[in-house]
Amino acid sequence: MGSQVWVVATLLVSIVLIVLTIVKLKFHPFLALLLASFFVGAMMGMSPLDMVNAIESGIGGTLGFLAAVIGLGTILGKMMEVSGAAERIGIALQRCRWLSADVIMVLVGLICGITLFVEVGVVLLIPLAFSIAKKTNTSLLKLAIPLCTALMAVHCVVPPHPAALFVTNKLGADVGTVIVYGLMVGLMASLVGGPLFLKLLGNRLPFKPVPAEFSDLKVREEHTLPSLGATLFTVLLPIALMLVKTIAELNMAKDGTLYTLLEFIGNPITAMFIAVFVAYYLLGIRQHMGMGTMLTHTEHGFGSIANILLIIGAGDRKSTRLNSSHANVSR
């Protein structure tokens, strides 16, 4: 009992240490997580050499799978961004007259958020919110809140986004299954946190017009955008491949050639790899974009994931330190 109390106390102190070093001392999260890992290891009686060895082996093991999928997802998101595919989805949903403007923004955020990091999605899609707000004389808040809620919900719970993919990998869950349930949860959370929340606020929500400095900000001309079919095919292809793998695991004999093929193409790395080259063709080459230009966009996209990969690696080391030092309370 005493050892369990010590473990829980150490864990709680390590969390406080992470928060304080990031918020008060302005440490980078990667450094804060490494510091917490060393702290937990020391409190659990691990030798310095064991702690260093665990960091060396653990970061590589964790990122071996995640780095490939996150990197490929970054390329896919970058192609969505530079080709205007995200705007295409928004324009198409705008034409669904039976949908209210806030629900449209939820669906735009939900679909585009599958391949876009949340901050990229906000920057990329906010001109669409500005455009709808001006055309319909709607408060910008009624459009921006549902959009940001949907983007954040997908970013948190749907692979191949880093946090959701990391948890899925650690738990040994099937990626296809997690995507299906994640999209369902993300949709419900977005509808509650967006349109329903706005209805509950009612007239208490202030009217926010489009800022004057952004009044002339426009969505790209429609004829320059990729087709809706090409856009949706690119976005949904990796999800479909992973779902096919999930269905095969549930319904097929595991010693057949077809099953092996479906397992291969449905692996998250393979599925994202295939989707990237489809995006290069449908969203790049067919949009008159040269390979040199796409290479430049790809390289620019990779710069945004360095922090994510380091933080994931360091965060997993803290978890592994707890397990390595018999700090798993469930034991």
What does each of the following model-derived ranges do?
Residues 15, 37-38, 110, 186-190:
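Residue-level recognition of pore/gate-forming positions within transmembrane alpha-helices
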